[in-house]
Swiss-Prot record:
It comes from the Bacteria. InterPro entries: LysR_subst-bd (IPR005119), Tscrpt_reg_HTH_LysR (IPR000847), WH-like_DNA-bd_sf (IPR036388), WH_DNA-bd_sf (IPR036390). It is found in: Cytoplasm. Positive regulator of the catBC operon that degrades catechol to acetyl-CoA. CatR binds in trans to the catR-catBC promoter-control region in the presence or absence of inducer but only activates the catBC operon in the presence of the inducer, cis-cis-muconate. GO terms for cellular component: cytoplasm; protein-DNA complex. Residues 18-37 bind DNA. Belongs to the LysR transcriptional regulatory family. Residues 1-57 form the HTH lysR-type domain. It comes from Pseudomonas putida. This is HTH-type transcriptional regulator CatR. Its main location: cytoplasm. Keywords: Activator, Aromatic hydrocarbons catabolism, Cytoplasm, DNA-binding, Transcription, Transcription regulation. GO terms for biological process: catabolic process. Gene3D superfamilies: Periplasmic binding protein-like II, Winged helix-like DNA-binding domain superfamily/Winged helix DNA-binding domain.
Length: 289
């Protein structure tokens, strides 16, 4: 059995059409059919029921899942070798989930156009980003918390206004609010751990205005917090860019307080002048123009 057998079968399993699979593989249909038959002979079982419509056998479904894993490992092996030989580049990016709505998406789109660049995208909190940068697991990171670490350089890319998230039928959901109006509400904060986190940014915002809030529920993820708001557990604050996630069971309400913002912060290793990191900085600067 050779890797080409796995690649041929994978495409056939995904198209369930010999003609279409042959076109995608840039081979004629008869050779493809022979290759699949050879594979079945080697395995001692049928993988495909050759009827209309074409369908996979139970063994075929299992073999498809396993062959995808093998091909993925082969791809990892090939790319690792090419990166080591300087034929490809690798860029590790860490990001807090809420930064996916602003700045980061356009950067990823630009970088993905480079066929010789392998991207590693890692969802992580700001604290996790710092450790990953120090260990070399990632090269740049996007978060929302300022960290004082001599090994890390941070750059504020923009200030994202905060908005309140309220249940659809909440009496305060009809017009812009002040923090003082929200202070008496039960709050859902996220993430619960590790700290400090975006949650501490929200707590500090109220403390700066001489107020404290009652946290009725902690959540680990932004979307979990919004879901809990929808069912009436409490209210929360999110960056305004999150409003791109439309829901019919909540209301996003603007805040009138001028300081109610959350920064998007780019973090990288201090002194890192690698070409790929400099390229990212250039692309980000171009976005801001």
């Amino acid at each position: 059995m050779e890797l080409r057998h796995l690649r041929y079968f994978k495409v056939l399993a995904e198209t369930l059409n010999f003609t279409r699979a042959a076109e995608l593989l840039h081979i004629a249909q008869p050779p493809l059919s022979r290759q699949i038959s050879q594979l079945e002979d080697q395995l001692g079982t049928l993988l495909v029921v050759r009827e209309r419509p074409l369908r996979l056998t139970e063994a075929g479904r299992f073999f498809y899942e396993q062959s995808c894993t093998v091909l993925q490992l082969q791809n990892i092996s090939d790319n690792t070798r090419r990166i080591g030989q300087g034929q490809r580049q690798w860029l590790g990016i860490g990001f807090a989930p809420s930064t996916l709505y602003k700045v980061l998406p356009e950067l990823i789109r630009e970088l993905r156009q480079d066929s010789e660049l392998e991207l590693g995208l890692n969802e992580m909190t700001t604290l996790q980003q710092v450790e990953a940068l120090k260990s070399g697991r990632i090269d740049i990171a996007f978060g929302r918390i300022r960290i004082d670490d001599p090994a890390i350089h941070q750059q504020v890319l923009c200030e994202d206004p905060l908005v309140a998230v309220l249940p659809k039928d909440h009496p305060l959901a009809s017009s812009p609010l002040t923090l003082a109006q929200l202070a008496g509400e039960a709050f859902i904060l996220y993430p619960a751990n590790p700290r400090p986190s975006y949650a501490d940014h929200v707590l500090a915002l109220f403390a700066h205005h001489g107020m404290s809030i009652h946290v009725s529920q902690w959540a680990n993820e932004l979307q979990t917090a919004i879901g809990l708001v929808a069912v009436g557990v409490g209210v929360t604050l999110v960056p305004a860019s999150v409003q791109q996630q439309h829901r019919t069971d909540i209301e996003y309400v603007s805040l009138l307080d001028s300081g109610a913002v959350s920064p998007i912060i780019l973090s990288r290793r201090k002194g890192d002048v690698s070409p790929i990191v400099q390229r990212c900085l250039t692309l980000i600067a171009q976005q801001a123009e």
